Structures are given as structure tokens and as C-alpha cells.
Amino acid sequence: NPKVFTLRNIPDTYRIKDFIDNNNPKSAVVVGGGYIGIEMAENLKHAGLDVTVVELMNHVIATIDYDMAGDVHNHLRHNGIRLILEDGVKAVEDSGDKLKVTLGKGELECDMVILSVGVKPESTLAVQAGLEVNSRGAIVTDEHMLTSDKDIYAVGDAVEITDTVTGEKGF
């Protein structure tokens, strides 16, 4: 559907911007409350759209705890972004001029949907360079961000990190 977008790379952002410029949507649903989904929600709001974020967990940004996420929730709501937590999207149907987004606990109508869920790190270049990646595709680094190649350091969204509190690996 031309009103439903994924968000994984720069060309995806161009398609979203072109749709907004050419169709003047009034509302959007962002599916997924990770870093990318939240950033997109803020940008859509800044562009003048009514924005709803739907997140399956009880808080946005899975890598932070619930208490810290509360500040993010307050910031988003203060800026007019609606949050629907602990609910997921079951279906998206095009009813002509609007999209109907069916949730587990209700329905929403909007002009466009951004899918920002299940994003895998873009580590193709790292793999081609022979760097070690974990089972989820994130670039493995040590506590100094050094990769498996002693001459290459890595930072950014595609890098495995160690949670300073729990010691668990993530990205």
C-alpha cells in the first residue's frame, strides 16, 4: 500500500517525505516505539501531523527501564504525540481516503502508517570487512568500542553494547 511505509534507510525517509509533500496527510500512526519510531513520530509532529505511536511493550525505547521511559512518555505527550502502550497492530486496511489500523484493543484511522518494528542492524559493510557480528547482526565490540579487527572501532545503531547495569548485551 502506498500509504504504508517501512523505515530502515535513507531512501525510505525520502519516500515518506515525498508522500507528505505530495499528499498533505493530516495524521499518522507509527508502529514501534524504539529510537527510530520515536524520532519519526517527533518529525511527523513537527511537520504538522497528528501522530499516534503504538508500542507492544509497556514503555517506549526497550533499552531503557520503565522509570526512565516515563520521562520520554511525558515529553511525547506534552508535545502532542499520542501513545498507545501494551497493544499491537493486527491489520492495516485501506478504506479509500483513510487507513484503518486494527489494534488488539481497538481501531485507529489515519492517512499514513510508518512501520518501525523488528529493525535489524545494517551491518553489511562490517560483514564484508570481516568483522564479527552477533546473532542479531550487530557489530561486536569491546568496552572501548574496538571491533574484532584491532584497527577498527565502531559506533552507532548497528553496534552491540553492554548494559552498564545488567551486563547484558544488546544493540
Please state what every model-predicted region is.
Residues 43-46, 95-96, 153-158:
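Short hydrophobic/aromatic-rich motifs at helix boundaries and adjacent loops
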Residues 46-143:
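A Rossmann-like FAD-binding core segment of flavoenzymes
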Residues 29, 84, 153:
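Conserved catalytic/dimer-interface elements of ABC ATPase nucleotide-binding domains
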Residues 12-64, 81:
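Rossmann-like NAD(P)H-binding beta-loop-alpha module
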Residues 2-21, 100, 107-171:
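FAD-site-proximal beta/loop scaffold in flavoenzymes
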